[in-house]
Amino acid sequence: MRSEKHLLPLPPLLAICCLGTLHLSSGFPQSVPSYLEGLDIPESEIPSFVMDLCSSIYNRMKVNEENNHEIYKRFLFQFSRAKDPSLKIGESQIATAEYTKRDSSGIVGRPFFLFRPRNGRKVSINEH
């Protein structure tokens, strides 16, 4: 994946390849590659054939890019939403009330937690 940063983007690279296969009448002698000679296409129609081929490839790539963009947006939307908390506030209050320390005289009044309270908070004895 790191090598993609050094390569040209695909549409300009595709355009360069397509233009390289065409006959240019501006004085640059260019030969038609051997793979185009076996297609039984007259030389006058080869440039239009190559351009049609290039445009169909480019249009197919464009559709794939749009689909990838939609999938990426859906992925971001799905995972950027806040999740429902697994333990709701009401349930945690019930769980705290059920687990209280007891001694011989009854309930001391200071709840203990299965897990340590967040942010280093401590429960004072006078609160309950």
Curated annotation (Swiss-Prot):
This is Neuromedin-S. Residues 28-72, 75-100, 123-128 form a propeptide. Expressed by the skin glands. It comes from Bombina variegata. GO terms for cellular component: extracellular region. Residues 1-27 form the signal peptide. Keywords: Amidation, Secreted, Signal. The keyword Mitochondrion does not apply. It comes from the Eukaryota. Belongs to the NmU family. It is found in: Secreted. Neuromedin-S-17: stimulates uterine smooth muscle contraction (B similarity). Synthetic peptide NmS-17 induces calcium mobilization in CHO cells transfected with either human FM-3/GPR66 (EC(50)=0.085 nM) or FM-4/TGR-1 (EC(50)=0.231 nM) NmU/NmS receptors. The modification Asparagine amide is found at residue 119.
